Regions:
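Active-site nucleophile and cofactor-binding loops and adjacent substrate-binding regions
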Residues: 88-92, 114-121, 141-143, 191
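Active-site C-terminal subdomain of aminotransferase-like
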Residues: 236-310
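Short acidic, glycine/serine/threonine-rich loops at helix termini
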Residues: 126-129, 150-155, 198-202, 227-233, ...
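N-terminal entrance/gating region of PLP-dependent enzymes' catalytic architecture
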Residues: 1-110
């Protein structure tokens, strides 16, 4: 029932990784008998979870990661890289840049800026923070949008307002235009797959409104982002996903339909110049090369390099 063959592959990969380090022998003091007791207790306690890993469970996002993602994450934990700076994880930082570039390409972004996060909540907060620095004004989102947007606006002290949804649960573009006429909207958050109904906001209509009123568009695709790859969407929905190349920022959660271990979110920006907003200096934070250290473009400091490896 639980896939276990990958454990053998992990042992082999560990030996290969160890062979790459030319270090003097170092013995670790580990009480394996006690460790076995603890793991047995953990195994029993973990039985008090719903078995979402079984195919009988459908229609929810708490799926186990892909076997290779899970095993790669475990392998990385023997190093435990920190992708804040290259010194903490040179190769895992390189992998993160590759992953982010792949996701940006999936949405049609050319030049881009982005990084992985602990999840969609942190990624959305960062996107809203950048939006507030670039374009002053309140942030609006559909009344079907995830509650995190209103909450993060409260944290960031940014005015927030809900836009009425239509009968299908999508943002009502006519109601949005009434708000835009006031001239005090800085950013419109669209949802690509609402949590309750899985609906996609009318990006085509919202882009037309942007040409008229000038505002930022942030796409919350934490849940629905990977449907960009789906081949069975209706043409109108498919068009909305293709139009994502025109938004200012996108959030996607690889730990949902990307089959990655929790927590792994990602924030992407269409304009790399927003990197200047992250500039900071302190006597205990410095970077040892001209190559980009991901901590230079992230609100989070320590971040698990294992997420990028997976």
């Amino acid at each position: 029932m639980l896939e276990k063959e990958s454990v053998k592959l992990l042992s082999k990969s560990l030996a290969s990784m160890e062979a790459g380090f030319d270090l003097p022998h170092s013995a670790q003091s580990i009480e394996y008998a006690r460790m076995a007791e603890v793991l047995e207790e953990v195994a029993k306690r973990m039985q008090n979870n719903y078995p979402y890993f079984h195919p009988l469970f459908a229609g929810q996002m708490i799926k186990p990661p892909h076997p290779i993602a899970r095993t790669a994450y475990q392998l990385a934990m023997w190093i435990n890289p920190n992708n804040h700076a290259l010194d903490g994880g040179r190769e895992s930082s390189k992998m993160e840049k590759e992953v982010v570039a792949d996701l940006a390409r999936m949405f049609g972004f050319g030049q881009h800026l982005g990084h992985l996060t602990g999840g969609g909540t942190m990624a959305n907060m960062e996107a809203l923070w950048v939006a507030s620095q670039v374009r002053r004004g309140k942030i609006v989102a559909s009344d079907q949008a995830h509650y995190t947007h209103q909450r993060m606006c409260e944290v960031l002290k940014i005015p927030f307002e809900k836009v009425k949804g239509d009968r299908a649960g999508r943002m009502d573009a006519r109601a949005l235009e009434q708000m835009l006429k006031t001239g005090d909207v800085g950013t419109v958050v669209i949802t690509m797959g609402t949590t309750g109904l899985g609906m996609v906001d009318p990006l085509d209509e919202i882009l037309a409104l942007r040409r008229k009123y000038d505002f930022r568009i942030h796409a919350d695709a934490a849940y629905g982002g990977y449907f960009r790859l789906a081949k069975n969407l209706d043409p109108h929905t498919q068009e909305k996903y293709e139009l994502l190349r025109n938004v200012d920022s996108i959030v996607i959660d690889p730990h949902k339909h990307g089959l990655q271990p929790y927590g792994c979110g990602c924030v992407l920006f269409n304009d790399p110049s927003v990197a200047t907003l992250y500039l900071h200096d302190s006597p205990y934070t410095y970077y040892t090369s001209d190559e980009l250290h991901l901590g230079e473009i992230s609100l989070e400091c320590s971040r698990a390099g294992a997420s990028a490896v997976a």
